[in-house]
Amino acid sequence: MIIDRAGRACFNRRPMATIGCVYLVGAGPGDPGLLTRRGADLIGCADVLAYDALCNPSLLKLAPESAEIIYAGKRAADHAIPQGELNQLLVQKACEGKTVVRLKGGDPFVFGRGGEEAEELAEAGVPFEIVPGISSSVAAPAYAGIPVTHRDHCSSYTVITGHERPEKGNESSINWKQLAESDGTKVILMGVERIRGIAERLMENGLDVETPVGMVRWGTTCRQETLTGTLETIADLVEQKGFKAPAVTIVGGVVDLREQLSWFERRPLFGRRVVVTRTRTQASVLGARLSELGADVLEIPTIKIAEPEDQEALRDGLLGLGSYQWLVFTSPNGVDCFFNYFFKGFDDLRDLGGCRIAAVGPATAAKLKALHLKIDLMPDCYTAEGVAAAFRDSEEYSIENENVALFRAQVASPELPRELESLGAIVDDIPVYQTVSETEDRNGAVARLEEGGADWITFTSSSTAEHFDARFGLVATLEKHGARVLSIGPETTKALKKLGVEPAVEAQPHSIDGMVEALMAAAG
């Protein structure tokens, strides 16, 4: 058994001297939360990950950093890699002894050409496994509030493709008469471009022209759009609205239930696109909160955490821990980095000495509490002035003539140590990390920003703003896309103003919760 970098057990890796294995994994319909646990575990162990156009790009971050990522997208006649070449590539990578994950939208065996790929692997003697995924044929209707079966309406449903093999010409393997006469719901995949012909065939074969029709575009994602009409009107509506693929079409009386059962598109941030610029490991925290509320989240980390350039102060601080009366942590990164160094030299938390601990913000406090450390002081306002005020107003604690260790970023505002010194403290400002530029875009979020813009760009620190500006040009990005800026607090706002940007909103309180509340309020 091998444990991957996320701590997951990878039972299926094989020694590199032997042939590898190919996993045909269903990525689900688009919502990353609908990926199966088995699928997530396999992505986390992949040496090679080949993914389709309809796979949510955010799933790529589950792969090891060392994994080879191959885009194998197919849209109509535009294939990044022709199917035959892709089949051979899967065989080749497996024969190199690699663990290969072929990530396919929906389910591999539901109009996903997974059968063809599995046949090729079987003929080549390459071990393979099929990992089913949730098909858009049921998931997209569900997210639109349309049940494909309902005791009061129908007890069956039929799924067909609206895009048969081109070489069939006008020939069709679909029995349209039987389909039209059946009482069940009709679900059509890949049928947007041919919706007029599909509707005409159903009507020609006796299906009532007033039969309700629903079309769900980008189902289960925050880009979801739903169009409803009847067999007689749907094709004209598609043309009028410019409704494009990918979409699932549902034909039947159950479509009328959408008016009562719609839920996904009613979430408070639905339809808003929000850019999150935190570090790659932290972006998911804010991103997940926003996604749950319906936002289309683009995770574009602009910084990553690295060791401080000069570690002498850190070494001295660790060796002199027993001399401090207070340890002050201003961010979750500060906690993580400090204790990473601490546990390299000490085995026992009691080696911190008899100090008290101050934490700035609930996220910082949560990191410390996870280590079973008591927070002695946490200011109501998460700023330098707030920390100083908390000490100044405290009836229990005085820091006059006390030694205070301040563990934070290498580049940080001098205001906090100055405020603490004004209260008589002897302050050691100890850098435990630095922020450096992050330029990698594994999930395609930068391209999506360029193509479709954003409603909001969020900044959680001065460094995220400065590095975003250095990489993209903040003012130019805002002017191009008409986006608004959300700042977590005063220090970040100061940095933004220096860059020529006035935030539309500053979070109150200055925390992730405050940022979420601010976006909710702005959405109305």
Model-derived features with residue positions:
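Signature of uroporphyrinogen-III synthase
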Residues: 16, 30, 76, 82-86, ...
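Short, well-ordered beta-strand core segments
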Residues: 47-49, 69, 147, 186, ...
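Class I S-adenosyl-L-methionine
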Residues: 2-4, 10-32, 37-134, 139, ...
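A short alpha->loop->secondary-structure connector
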Residues: 122-126, 148-150, 204-210, 345-353, ...
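Short, charged beta->alpha transition segments
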Residues: 57, 86-93, 143-147, 172-176, ...
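Conserved anion/nucleotide-ligand pocket segment
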Residues: 167-214
